């Protein structure tokens, strides 16, 4: 039987998984890498760490699967918006990667907004003027690395999101490409026409010579170096992490929603061929592109989801492992009604306040680790409801009323029950929770002719558990109103 390698390059770790042609998981390898915080609000990665962790985990996963040379295709999924610029001749990065969480270009975004540029940018890219996206990060690098812009104009430097950089490394510098979903997150790509936007590139003084070729999500992206896996292997599927999860969750029908809980939380609502312009400051993006046909989505992005649990562990040191939050939340005094607004790197959708900072409301002398754990987990549910309320307001034909979930936090039954309670809708957790890697594997497998098309793949999606709302409507509304007051207070400071 043929096998597929899925590379999942995330914000805090790189993972690789081997699937067989029926998309059953055969092996997993994972490796964390350092986070770099040069200044408050700045977040960087060393691109060599990204590459070395990907190469190591890919080899390890293939070895553990014991597949005897039957590797037929590679799919890649990745943290989006993160920016790498490297030398064409050597492949060496000219600076650390600037990560999607980084806020250093907030002033630049503000000045562009004040100059009246946001409506044009939003109309073409579907995105808002925010440091989250790649474009202003690229400009910052070209402005601050000596000689970079001139070198880029001469064709000596290349830009890419993480997928593009990894493909360059995997292919030994033979392929400078990306896919439509990653391109759509740069704020340089016209999602209406499916091409790089010359006017926006000119506005930011970004030479178009450094941009990668854009392909479908299932397409030939290049062949790996023979020394990596013993022979050349085709890279046949690429999608940004949230779009890969959308595919892995089989959200192919307009109106279907999924929400992924990792470092951040990202909810996507499939809007089909309709490019819905948000009135609620959500993002209009490409869900996936197959056969040259773009399927669009509304997306809401929360910067801090699983990261709030990391804060409990690494910042407050009230837990040693993430799994401890479940027991603490269950044992907490719900009457205290503690509220945490985890705006550690600003507020994401639908607020988009990069300068806001986190706060805790309702502290008493009896507030302890259990109450903090409960409030931290609840904050993720509240933020998800913020996104879903905005989606429902934007698209009358929208949300079917069931939310499909995936990601590390979904292992917590307590968190998923609270999520169902606070959004007032069923939450479906799939049997296969590695939906991001699954989506990448499916894209590559479909292109290789090993896996079925969307309709047949969707028919095989399996439910592990449905969480139905149990909370009384009056309680739900009161708790959500309290959250709203807390968010407004944070934005007012």
Curated annotation (Swiss-Prot):
<keyword id="KW-0547">Nucleotide-binding</keyword>
<dbReference type="InterPro" id="IPR005999">
    <property type="entry name" value="Glycerol_kin"/>
</dbReference>
<dbReference type="Pfam" id="PF00370">
    <property type="entry name" value="FGGY_N"/>
</dbReference>
<dbReference type="InterPro" id="IPR000577">
    <property type="entry name" value="Carb_kinase_FGGY"/>
</dbReference>
<feature type="binding site">
    <location>
        <position position="241"/>
    </location>
    <ligand>
        <name>sn-glycerol 3-phosphate</name>
    </ligand>
</feature>
<feature type="binding site">
    <location>
        <position position="408"/>
    </location>
    <ligand>
        <name>ATP</name>
    </ligand>
</feature>
<keyword id="KW-0808">Transferase</keyword>
<dbReference type="GO" id="GO:0019563">
    <property type="term" value="P:glycerol catabolic process"/>
</dbReference>
<dbReference type="GO" id="GO:0004370">
    <property type="term" value="F:glycerol kinase activity"/>
</dbReference>
<dbReference type="Pfam" id="PF02782">
    <property type="entry name" value="FGGY_C"/>
</dbReference>
<comment type="similarity">
    <text>Belongs to the FGGY kinase family.</text>
</comment>
<feature type="binding site">
    <location>
        <position position="408"/>
    </location>
    <ligand>
        <name>ADP</name>
    </ligand>
</feature>
<feature type="binding site">
    <location>
        <position position="81"/>
    </location>
    <ligand>
        <name>glycerol</name>
    </ligand>
</feature>
<comment type="pathway">
    <text>Polyol metabolism; glycerol degradation via glycerol kinase pathway; sn-glycerol 3-phosphate from glycerol: step 1/1.</text>
</comment>
<feature type="binding site">
    <location>
        <position position="11"/>
    </location>
    <ligand>
        <name>ADP</name>
    </ligand>
</feature>
<dbReference type="InterPro" id="IPR018483">
    <property type="entry name" value="Carb_kinase_FGGY_CS"/>
</dbReference>
<dbReference type="InterPro" id="IPR018485">
    <property type="entry name" value="FGGY_C"/>
</dbReference>
<dbReference type="GO" id="GO:0006072">
    <property type="term" value="P:glycerol-3-phosphate metabolic process"/>
</dbReference>
<dbReference type="InterPro" id="IPR043129">
    <property type="entry name" value="ATPase_NBD"/>
</dbReference>
<feature type="binding site">
    <location>
        <position position="15"/>
    </location>
    <ligand>
        <name>ADP</name>
    </ligand>
</feature>
<feature type="binding site">
    <location>
        <position position="132"/>
    </location>
    <ligand>
        <name>glycerol</name>
    </ligand>
</feature>
<dbReference type="GO" id="GO:0006071">
    <property type="term" value="P:glycerol metabolic process"/>
</dbReference>
<feature type="binding site">
    <location>
        <position position="11"/>
    </location>
    <ligand>
        <name>sn-glycerol 3-phosphate</name>
    </ligand>
</feature>
<feature type="binding site">
    <location>
        <position position="11"/>
    </location>
    <ligand>
        <name>ATP</name>
    </ligand>
</feature>
<feature type="binding site">
    <location>
        <position position="263"/>
    </location>
    <ligand>
        <name>ADP</name>
    </ligand>
</feature>
<dbReference type="InterPro" id="IPR018484">
    <property type="entry name" value="FGGY_N"/>
</dbReference>
<feature type="binding site">
    <location>
        <position position="242"/>
    </location>
    <ligand>
        <name>glycerol</name>
    </ligand>
</feature>
<feature type="binding site">
    <location>
        <position position="132"/>
    </location>
    <ligand>
        <name>sn-glycerol 3-phosphate</name>
    </ligand>
</feature>
<dbReference type="GO" id="GO:0005829">
    <property type="term" value="C:cytosol"/>
</dbReference>
<feature type="binding site">
    <location>
        <position position="81"/>
    </location>
    <ligand>
        <name>sn-glycerol 3-phosphate</name>
    </ligand>
</feature>
<keyword id="KW-0418">Kinase</keyword>
<comment type="function">
    <text>Key enzyme in the regulation of glycerol uptake and metabolism. Catalyzes the phosphorylation of glycerol to yield sn-glycerol 3-phosphate.</text>
</comment>
<feature type="binding site">
    <location>
        <position position="80"/>
    </location>
    <ligand>
        <name>sn-glycerol 3-phosphate</name>
    </ligand>
</feature>
<feature type="binding site">
    <location>
        <position position="310"/>
    </location>
    <ligand>
        <name>ATP</name>
    </ligand>
</feature>
<feature type="binding site">
    <location>
        <position position="263"/>
    </location>
    <ligand>
        <name>ATP</name>
    </ligand>
</feature>
<keyword id="KW-0067">ATP-binding</keyword>
<feature type="binding site">
    <location>
        <position position="13"/>
    </location>
    <ligand>
        <name>ATP</name>
    </ligand>
</feature>
<feature type="binding site">
    <location>
        <position position="241"/>
    </location>
    <ligand>
        <name>glycerol</name>
    </ligand>
</feature>
<feature type="binding site">
    <location>
        <position position="306"/>
    </location>
    <ligand>
        <name>ADP</name>
    </ligand>
</feature>
<protein>
    <recommendedName>
        <fullName>Glycerol kinase</fullName>
        <ecNumber>2.7.1.30</ecNumber>
    </recommendedName>
</protein>
<keyword id="KW-0319">Glycerol metabolism</keyword>
<feature type="binding site">
    <location>
        <position position="80"/>
    </location>
    <ligand>
        <name>glycerol</name>
    </ligand>
</feature>
């Amino acid at each position: 039987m043929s096998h597929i390698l899925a590379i999942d390059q995330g914000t805090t770790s790189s993972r690789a998984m081997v699937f067989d042609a029926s998309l059953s998981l055969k092996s997993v390898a994972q490796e964390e890498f350092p986070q770099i915080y040069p200044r408050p609000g700045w977040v960087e990665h060393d691109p060599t760490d990204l590459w070395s962790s990907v190469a190591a985990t890919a080899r390890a996963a293939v070895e553990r699967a014991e597949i005897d040379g039957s590797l037929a295709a590679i799919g890649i999924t990745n943290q989006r918006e993160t920016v790498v610029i490297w030398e064409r001749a050597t492949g060496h990065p000219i600076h650390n990667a600037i990560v999607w969480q980084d806020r250093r270009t907030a002033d630049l975004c503000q000045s562009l907004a004040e100059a009246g540029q946001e409506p044009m940018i939003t109309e073409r890219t579907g995105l808002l003027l925010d440091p989250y996206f790649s474009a202003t990060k690229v400009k910052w690098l070209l402005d601050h690395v000596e000689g970079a812009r001139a070198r880029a104009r001469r064709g000596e430097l290349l830009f890419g999101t993480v997928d593009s950089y990894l493909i360059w490394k995997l292919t030994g510098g033979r392929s400078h490409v990306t896919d439509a979903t990653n391109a759509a997150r740069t704020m340089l790509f016209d999602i209406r026409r499916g091409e790089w936007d010359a006017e926006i590139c000119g506005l930011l003084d970004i030479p178009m010579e450094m941009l990668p070729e854009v392909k479908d999500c299932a397409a030939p992206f290049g062949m790996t170096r023979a020394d990596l896996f013993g022979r050349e292997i085709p890279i046949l599927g690429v999608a940004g992490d949230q779009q890969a999860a959308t595919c892995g969750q089989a959200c192919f029908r307009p109106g279907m929603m999924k929400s992924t809980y990792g470092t951040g939380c990202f909810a996507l609502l499939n809007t089909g061929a309709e490019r819905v312009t948000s009135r609620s400051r959500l993002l209009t993006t490409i869900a996936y592109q197959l056969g040259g046909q773009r399927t669009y989505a509304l997306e809401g992005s929360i910067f801090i989801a699983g990261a709030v649990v990391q804060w409990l562990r690494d910042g407050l040191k009230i837990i040693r492992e993430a799994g401890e939050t479940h027991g603490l939340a269950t044992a907490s005094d719900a009457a205290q009604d503690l509220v945490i607004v985890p705006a550690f790197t600003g507020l994401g959708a639908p607020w988009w306040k990069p300068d806001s900072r986190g706060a805790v409301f309702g502290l008493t002398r009896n507030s302890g680790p259990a109450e903090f754990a409960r409030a931290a987990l609840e904050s993720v549910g509240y933020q998800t409801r913020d996104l879903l309320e905005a989606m429902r307001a934007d698209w009358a034909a929208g949300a079917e009323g069931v939310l499909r979930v995936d990601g590390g936090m979904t292992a917590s039954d307590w968190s998923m029950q609270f999520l169902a309670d606070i959004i007032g809708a069923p939450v479906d957790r799939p049997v296969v929770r590695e939906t991001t890697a699954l989506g990448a594997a499916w894209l590559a497998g479909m292109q290789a002719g090993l896996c079925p098309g969307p309709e047949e793949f969707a028919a095989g999606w399996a439910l592990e558990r449905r969480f139905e709302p149990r909370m009384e409507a009056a309680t739900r509304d009161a708790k959500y109103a309290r959250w709203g007051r807390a968010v407004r207070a944070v934005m007012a400071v």
